A protein has these predicted regions:
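Bacterial N-terminal signal peptides that target proteins for export
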Residues: 1-8
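C-terminal motif of bacterial Sec signal peptides marking the signal peptidase cleavage site
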Residues: 13-16
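Bacterial signal peptide processing site
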Residues: 18-21
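Extracellular mucin-like PTS domains
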Residues: 23-56
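A surface/extracellular/periplasmic glyco- and lipid-processing/surface-interacting theme
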Residues: 55-101, 108-367
């Protein structure tokens, strides 16, 4: 039984061993690695630098009275005129180097007085302040200025100021209604110790509701730039006599300015300790007489400032001889050359030297 079972099993095994070998599975070919497609190169967007907004060009303005470059808010503001003492004990005075225009003219008793006119530059110290006179009031009227003074003679206070205040000038009298703008110093004796400042005067002017601005176009003279250095003379001088000493000027070609002297000594401004300097010196001859109605003991000068007369204009180291003309009390004194053309002044401080007809003024200057 057992034998019969083994034979078939062997046969099966033999048959299984003699069959054909199985076909091997094909080995897959290795596929080449895919080539990476390069990413497209993107050109960088150019960065535009932010454009800076240019700073606005400052507005150029020129002061009405002296033609100097100035802050537009100051170039046309109300001028302030202040009467200044020239007694020997009042020297040295304060405020000259801040003034746009300076007047000097004969006064009582053989003395003279100044009037300083301020516009774009402030003066922290002005004085000694003295009383007004009619012709100074009318010069202040040329600019419709605030008029600073310590009282005045009878005619000034009773006739001239009342007829001009609020119309041709704006009264700033230390003795009548504007005293807050003034003070007296202890280092000098009255009446040579009254002082003020442009700031104090403008505060009072504002409180009185005086205008803050000059009437447009009023008081404006023609101006010019400096002559080239090559055209300036190497030296020059001017001498203008007054009762208590001459006013002298020495021309400086380097700065195209006139260095001022009083009685042969350098004129120094007590406010800043610096030499007083002018850019233009104007000499006006006017007929001088004396007021027959002057108070007893006084001889009040009267200057004929309406009409025409002789004028010499010193600028750029040279002199132009011509005439002055003023139509009425509130009109600007105009300056004309020999051909009748209005004379242009150099930008900067103007000194106006008023003398009596016949006064001998000497100078060294081409012209």
């Amino acid at each position: 039984m057992t034998r019969h079972l083994r034979l078939p099993l062997i046969a099966v095994l033999v048959l299984g061993c003699s069959s054909a070998p199985p076909t091997p599975n094909p080995t897959p070919s290795a596929s080449p690695a895919p080539t990476a497609t390069p990413a497209p190169t993107i050109a960088p967007t150019p960065t535009t630098a932010p454009t800076e907004t240019p700073a606005p060009t400052p507005e150029i303005a020129y002061a009405a009275l002296d033609g100097m470059p100035a802050d537009p808010e100051l170039a046309n503001r109300l001028p302030i005129a202040v009467m200044i003492d020239d007694n020997v004990v009042a020297r040295p005075q304060s405020g000259f180097n801040a003034a746009s225009i300076v007047y000097q003219a004969p006064a009582d008793g053989g003395e003279d007085r100044y009037m300083l006119v301020f516009q774009e530059v402030d003066a922290p110290d002005i004085g000694p302040v003295r009383s007004g006179r009619p012709y100074f009031v009318y010069w202040a009227a040329e600019y419709r200025a605030g008029f600073g003074h310590y009282g005045g003679d009878e005619k000034t206070l009773k006739e001239v100021i009342p007829s001009t205040s609020g119309k041709l000038i704006y009264n700033l009298d230390a003795m009548f209604g504007s005293g807050k703008a003034y003070h007296r110093i202890s280092t000098r004796k009255a009446p040579h110790n009254g002082y003020t400042s442009t700031a104090a005067l403008r505060v009072v002017a504002a409180a009185k509701k005086y205008p803050a601005q000059l009437v447009d176009g009023l008081g404006v003279r023609p101006f010019k730039d400096d002559a080239p250095a090559s055209e300036r003379p190497v030296k020059g001088s001017i001498n203008v006599p007054y009762g208590r000493g001459a006013s002298g000027y020495t021309y400086d070609p380097a700065t195209n300015s006139y260095l001022r002297s009083v009685s042969g000594k350098p004129h120094v401004d007590a406010a800043d300790g610096k030499r007083v300097v002018a850019r233009n010196v104007i000499v006006l001859w006017m007929r001088l007489s004396y007021d027959p109605e002057s108070e007893p003991g006084h001889r009040r000068p009267v200057l004929d400032q309406i009409g025409t007369g002789t004028a010499w204009v010193f600028r750029d180291g040279t002199v132009i001889k011509g005439t002055w003309a003023k139509k009425d009390s509130g009109d600007l004194t105009r300056l004309y050359d020999g051909a009748g053309k209005e004379i242009s002044l150099v930008r900067g401080r103007i000194f106006i030297q008023v003398v009596a007809t016949g006064t001998k003024v000497t100078y060294d200057a081409p012209g």
